[in-house]
């Protein structure tokens, strides 16, 4: 993906699935085509682990087949094989701590390949969130995006890069880590230079500074110093 193909906005292409604590409401959305109205006070399932998204036995698959088993491990047993894939859901909304547990990479991939564009939750676990970024699955903790998406608004991509370091933000704009690295290695995009001045460093920081990619085109390595918060390869 080149800079001309970077995502600048996103529009909802499917339905919104609320992973509600009410089994009847969840079932109606999954199998009866029901669409729930936006309600910021709705009780949603908390602590959905990546093990629930893709149970261990599902992880024998590693390709688009994972879409068929998205969320089949969710407590209560309401979500059956192909339910998410065949439901036409573009957004999945849940409660606290989405993506806790083992942080297995198959979890967000199953959502992406089931057609999900955006994951919205009250908070998102770090490694799960990074895995989403790396494959192009957008995430947000801003529930106010939901009515905007429902109205058909094209949401600026900046809504999904808030709080990210410069490299992570560019990964999101490019639609994932592979597309970003392709552009980086082609010289289409240049990561921000580490400008940290020489400073006392820990052993780990010294190793990172010595191995940091200073120039992707020439392969030159090494920067004078790094500090916590620096973004680099």
Label each residue range with its predicted role.
Residues 1-233:
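Fe-S-dependent hydro-lyases/dehydratases of central metabolism
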């Amino acid at each position: 993906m080149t800079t001309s193909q970077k995502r600048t906005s996103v529009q909802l292409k499917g339905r919104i699935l609320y992973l509600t604590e009410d089994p009847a409401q969840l079932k109606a959305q999954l199998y009866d085509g029901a669409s729930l109205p936006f309600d910021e006070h709705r009780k949603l399932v908390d602590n959905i682990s990546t093990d629930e998204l893709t149970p261990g036995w599902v992880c024998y698959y590693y390709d688009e087949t994972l879409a068929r088993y998205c969320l089949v491990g969710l407590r209560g047993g309401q979500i059956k094989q192909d339910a998410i894939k065949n439901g036409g859901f573009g957004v999945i909304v849940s409660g606290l701590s989405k993506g806790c547990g083992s942080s297995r990479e198959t979890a967000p991939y199953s959502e992406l390949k089931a057609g999900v564009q955006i994951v919205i939750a009250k908070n998102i676990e770090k490694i799960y969130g990074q895995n989403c970024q790396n494959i192009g699955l957008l995430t947000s903790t801003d529930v106010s995006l939901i009515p905007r998406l429902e109205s058909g608004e094209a949401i600026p991509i900046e809504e999904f890069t808030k709080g990210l370091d410069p490299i992570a933000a560019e990964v999101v704009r490019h639609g994932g880590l592979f597309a970003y690295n392709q552009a980086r290695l082609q010289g289409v995009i240049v990561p921000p230079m580490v400008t940290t001045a020489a400073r006392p460093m820990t052993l780990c920081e010294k190793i990172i500074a010595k191995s940091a990619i200073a120039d992707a085109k020439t392969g030159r390595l090494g920067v004078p110093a790094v500090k916590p918060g620096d973004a680099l390869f």
